[in-house]
């Protein structure tokens, strides 16, 4: 069965606050049965949740981000949904929730995309369909203990790159610690992100045009890089000698998300013959980097043109779109859009006929 072409839609003026797709997918878990229900499609953007649910009151929730893109042959490719299934299972365990089984997670993602397939942007458009799986404690529970019921759902929306298509200016956060070493910074929960909003808004209003994004450092020494507020940190070093390969620098941090996009970049870099270096990266070491990128599902690959450290009055500057960034960006984009072969097996073709008769 043919996948429908994109709906009539003003893709370039899309407002992410609107949700006018056809609906979302829901699954429910009850402690009484110990099982998740089969996924069902709900033709509404709203959920029915008890007001005393731990997901609302105690932050017992986790989420993921995935993207789907349309190829020139009108196929739809979903990028690494299995990796998100594995990561969300780890996040759920961290906040005392039953993990969603791998196959149920992936099937629910395919269902949500298939039944909203006409909202996957055209192949030649610079956007994608953003897929948001989330899970939370949903039944009444006043005490600080697991509730009897949980909801897993998958929402989708047409999506334009989070930070646009230019370079970013970053400010190192010095008045706020995003996560502690033995805290929850390594899992994808809303509590890691909501407190950052006011600090991000404050940074945007600073003098000299403001800052696009915050860069967080470790809470203990305030010197080692964790990640950006919205994405992972990647540095590069150009080859110093003609026969030496360039390097990709990935900060080691127990308080940062294990980024799927960063992992993908590392695999691409390895296929180019570049060296991958995973080690702690200090603020001082920013001066030795050739390029810096912010990478994530919603952000994509975005070059960072400068990083500001106010307390030492230092600004680290980088190319707005260096050669290593351009090679990584083009290669990843071509794989995700079906323009080149996917030797890594990252893209899953949409199982459209399984859900649409």
Swiss-Prot record:
Give the signal sequence positions: none
Binding, pyridoxal 5'-phosphate: 87, 227
- InterPro entries assigned: Aminotrans_IV (IPR001544), Aminotransferase-like (IPR036038), B_amino_transII (IPR005786), BCAT-like_C (IPR043132), BCAT-like_N (IPR043131), BCAT_family (IPR033939)
Needs which cofactor? pyridoxal 5'-phosphate
The Gene Ontology biological process annotation of the record reads: branched-chain amino acid metabolic process; toxin biosynthetic process
Please tell me which top-level EC class this enzyme sits in.
Answer: transferase
Null-mutant phenotype, please? Answer: Does not affect growth and sporulation, but impairs the production of HC-toxin and related pathogenicity.
Q: In which pathway does it act?
A: Mycotoxin biosynthesis; HC-toxin biosynthesis
Name the Enzyme Commission number(s) assigned to this protein. 2.6.1.-
N6-(pyridoxal phosphate)lysine found at: 188
Q: Which GO terms describe its molecular function?
A: branched-chain-amino-acid transaminase activity
Pfam name, any one: Aminotran_4
- Report the superkingdom from the record: Eukaryota
Protein purpose? Aminotransferase, part of the diffuse TOX2 gene cluster that mediates the biosynthesis of the HC-toxin, cyclic tetrapeptide of structure cyclo(D-Pro-L-Ala-D-Ala-L-Aeo), where Aeo stands for 2-amino-9,10-epoxi-8-oxodecanoic acid. HC-toxin is a determinant of specificity and virulence in the interaction between the producing fungus and its host, maize. TOXF contributes to the synthesis of 2-amino-9,10-epoxi-8-oxodecanoic acid, an essential precursor for the production of the major forms of HC-toxin by the non-ribosomal peptide synthetase HTS1.
Which PANTHER family does the entry mention?
AMINO ACID AMINOTRANSFERASE, BRANCHED-CHAIN-AMINO-ACID AMINOTRANSFERASE 3, CHLOROPLASTIC-RELATED
The UniProt record's further free-text remark is:
The genes involved in HC-toxin biosynthesis, called collectively TOX2, are organized into a diffuse cluster that spans >500 kb. All of the known genes are duplicated or triplicated within this region, with some variation in copy number and chromosomal location among different race 1 strains.
Q: What name is this protein filed under?
A: Aminotransferase TOXF
């Amino acid at each position: 069965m043919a996948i429908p072409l994109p709906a009539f839609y003003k893709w370039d003026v899309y407002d992410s606050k609107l949700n006018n797709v056809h609906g979302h997918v829901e699954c429910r878990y009850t402690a009484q049965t110990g099982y998740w229900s089969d996924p069902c499609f709900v033709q509404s953007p709203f959920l029915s949740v008890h007001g005393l649910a731990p997901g609302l009151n105690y932050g017992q929730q986790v989420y993921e981000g995935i993207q789907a893109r349309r190829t020139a042959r009108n196929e739809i490719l979903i990028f690494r949904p299995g990796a998100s299934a594995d990561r969300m299972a780890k996040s759920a365990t961290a906040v005392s929730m039953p993990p969603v089984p791998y196959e149920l997670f992936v099937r629910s993602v395919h269902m949500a995309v298939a039944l909203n397939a006409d909202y996957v942007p055209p192949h030649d458009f610079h956007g994608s369909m953003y897929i948001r799986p989330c899970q939370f404690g949903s039944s009444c529970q006043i005490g600080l203990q697991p509730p009897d019921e949980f909801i897993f759902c998958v929402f989708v929306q047409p999506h334009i790159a989070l930070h646009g298509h230019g370079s970013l200016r970053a400010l190192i956060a010095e008045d706020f610690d995003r996560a502690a070493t033995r805290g929850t910074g390594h899992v994808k929960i809303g509590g890691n992100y909501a407190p950052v909003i006011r600090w991000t808004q404050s940074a945007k209003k600073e003098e000299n045009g403001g800052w696009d994004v915050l860069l967080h450092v470790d809470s203990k020494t305030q010197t080692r890089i964790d990640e950006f507020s919205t994405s992972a940190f990647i540095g590069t070093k150009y080859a110093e000698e003609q026969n030496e390969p360039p390097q990709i620098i990935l900060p080691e941090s127990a308080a940062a998300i294990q980024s799927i996009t960063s992992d993908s970049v590392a695999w691409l870099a390895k296929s180019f013959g570049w060296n991958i270096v995973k080690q702690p990266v200090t603020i001082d070491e920013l001066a030795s980097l050739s390029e810096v990128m912010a990478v994530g599902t919603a952000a994509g690959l975005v070059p960072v043109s400068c990083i500001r450290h106010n307390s030492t009055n230092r600004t680290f500057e980088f190319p707005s779109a260096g050669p290593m960034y351009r090679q990584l960006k083009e290669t990843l984009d071509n794989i995700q859009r079906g323009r080149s072969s996917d030797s890594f097996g990252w893209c899953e073709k949409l199982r459209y006929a399984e859900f649409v008769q």
